[in-house]
Amino acid sequence: MNAARCFGQATVLLTAISIARAFGLSGPTVISAGLLTALLMLIAWRDGATAADLGLAREDMRAGVRYGVGAFGLVLLILVAIALIPGTNSFLDDSRADISGGRLIYELTISIVLLTAIPEEFAFRGVLLGSGVRLWGPWRASLITSALFGLWHIVPTLHTMSDNRAISSASNNFAGQVLLVTGTVVATFIAGLVFSWLRLRSRSLIAPILAHIATNGLALLIAWFVAH
């Protein structure tokens, strides 16, 4: 595997898409996510990545499911606790949860699973982490790819920071925006480390995909129940 070329090309691609999103040039998410995944698959194939490098080896699927289900359950417990504690449940008061039941199903199944969790995990814990491990070893690769994962979330945070009513007031000034973006980058960096650990421990991409779905999907689901 040409790990250096694979990592470099994937990083350039992700940077280009992130810049395009910042200027509203990436088009519909279904197109940009599909294009990202297809190009990453091409990069991985041309550079000789194996199924094991990408976390897609069949023999590791069972471990991936086991670790992923465990992570899913842990996230559920944490979010339920947040929803039940008066001092923290305001963080689930998000205008993005003010949607119909039909729209909720679409967001959970299409937007979160197919257009977010799977493409992002294939990119960061599949192609980048797989090639990064060959270049620097597991822990340095985890740190680098998790940092990139945090930076990837700058543009979405700028677009959605006013949706959460608990923090929307902070988005009204530049200092507040910097604080919110920095907090999101740090939080997603930590999440990236956890997802990387799941991927390395189980050797399967299924584990971080399930954890990612839990983090995004269960948060939206519980916020929807809070809103309704």
Task: Go through each PLM region and give its residues.
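Aromatic-anchored segments of alpha-helical transmembrane domains
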Residues: 10-22, 75-81, 146-156, 215-221
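Structural signal for the C-terminal ends of transmembrane alpha-helices
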Residues: 42-51, 198-201
